[in-house]
Amino acid sequence: MERIVVTLGERSYPITIASGLFNEPASFLPLKSGEQVMLVTSETLAPLYLDKVRGVLEQAGVNVDSVILPDGEQYKSLAVLDTVFTALLQKPHGRDTTLVALGGGVVGDLTGFAAASYQRGVRFIQVPTTLLSQVDSSVGGKTAVNHPLGKNMIGAFYQPASVVVDLDCLKTLPPRELASGLAEVIKYGIILDGAFFNWLEENLDALLRLDGPAMAYCIRRCCELKAEVVVADERETGLRALLNLGHTFGHAIEAEMGYGNWLHGEAVAAGMVMAARTSERLGQFSSAETQRIITLLTRAGLPVNGPREMSAQAYLPHMLRDKKVLAGEIRLILPLAIGKSEVRSGVSHELVLNAIADCQSA
């Protein structure tokens, strides 16, 4: 069992990583006997895990209600958020309830925002079931829903009480979702840890076949890196912005193509190559390093070019609505070397468009 603590004073919380955690009531601490829980999951995951998690919580004396949400990024919306509020109010659940997010990034982000908002804030626990949510979205307290004009535009910083990562969930993950998660894994190596990127080059095949020790190390290292950044910059005023490598481009793809048509990790993968090409054009990143990124993403089964039907010009309106924009200027996360990156303002739109075009015609 791996255990990492995100140290944020009185809001500190553990990340527990192991197989078989759904069999142990102690995995869901700080829940105690007699407490109320609203378990939030999705239509795909409910048949797989709802009864199991409900059973282990009830075994611990916890009173469990549940709400099942439709699947897909397109449902990370205010309308679906309202169904969670309605379920909470119909019981009714008070401020002493705990929301448990059993699912991937959509369920986790939406449930976290529900917890931040309901009666001005109730406790919640993240139980991520996809690789992407295990290594990234469940850690750090970013919660949100989408708006038709932009991804994650309505949300809050709100930390969970704990994160429970059961590695067994990955056994039911479709290959495309596994690849999507690997995009975020590879991101950590590019922006923060060159040695981890080297390890990924050597061990990607083991991750693709869900080798237990390799996957446990991979998830632990990603969570360690994410925790270090969150502790240093919880509300993304500086360092934490680096975690958005590829996201400014990727969010534009998701919004333009329609949420759910490109998985988040797929869009981020293409966006990371666009960021690398931008950095190349600025003379601060080598084509050889870009090729290492492209090779690793391709081996993981991820796209390295943007959608053919989306012109370079179509990116700009979305990028100008990005949450990192300051004084009307796009801020980009750009690699300087494998394992080192920066937040860069003032890059000309022409250069950015040319970098996007590099990835459209490649």
Curated annotation (Swiss-Prot):
Belongs to the sugar phosphate cyclases superfamily. Dehydroquinate synthase family. Binds 1 divalent metal cation per subunit. Can use either Co(2+) or Zn(2+). Pfam families: DHQ_synthase, DHQS_C. This is 3-dehydroquinate synthase. InterPro entries: Dehydroquinate_synthase (IPR050071), DHQ_synth_AroB (IPR016037), DHQ_synth_fam (IPR030963), DHQS/DOIS_N (IPR030960), DHQS_C (IPR056179). Zn(2+) binds at E184, H247, H264. The lineage of its organism: Bacteria, Pseudomonadati, Pseudomonadota, Gammaproteobacteria, Enterobacterales. One of its GO terms (molecular function) is nucleotide binding. Its EC number is 4.2.3.4. It is found in: Cytoplasm.
